[in-house]
Amino acid sequence: MDIRLDSRRAIQAGPLVTTGRIAGAALRMARPFLGIARRLQFKAKAFELALRSVALQLMNDAMADADEAMEETEEDADALGGPRQEVRAVSDGTIVTEREMTCPQNRYCHECSWTGAAAGQNVAAKGAGAAVPGPNRRTGSGERRGYG
């Protein structure tokens, strides 16, 4: 048995060298895949940017459509000559106008027949208490805080 050959192999096959060889072989085998991964990563980034661009464009279009619809609604209200009333849908499906939203009872309902100036009599007649005409006194606007 030739000691040189065995010792050379033993030296070359030491733990660090073996690890280095394995790592080198793994890198050599993975090199084509790393190139593909880099190209795919670049393509994924470009795809992500394209998706963001499309999403941003869709959002801008939707905002423009919403603004246009609001302007048309305001023009229709002006053409009818009536006061502008913001109309909103409540979670149970009923439609409530701004006047109903400013009910002093802070309710999104038709219980008290809130009709602005005549609301005091309507609310008192139903025994719900005195009404305060005008905007909602609790929130300072027509916005609601709860379901009342």
Swiss-Prot record:
Residues 66-93, 124-148 are annotated as: Disordered. Residues 66-78 have a biased composition (Acidic residues). Residues 124-136 have a biased composition (Low complexity). Coiled coil: none annotated. Induction: By plant 4',7-dihydroxy-isoflavone or derivatives. Keywords: Nodulation. It comes from the Bacteria. Involved in efficiency of soybean nodulation and in nodulation delay. This is Nodulation protein NolJ. The gene is nolJ.
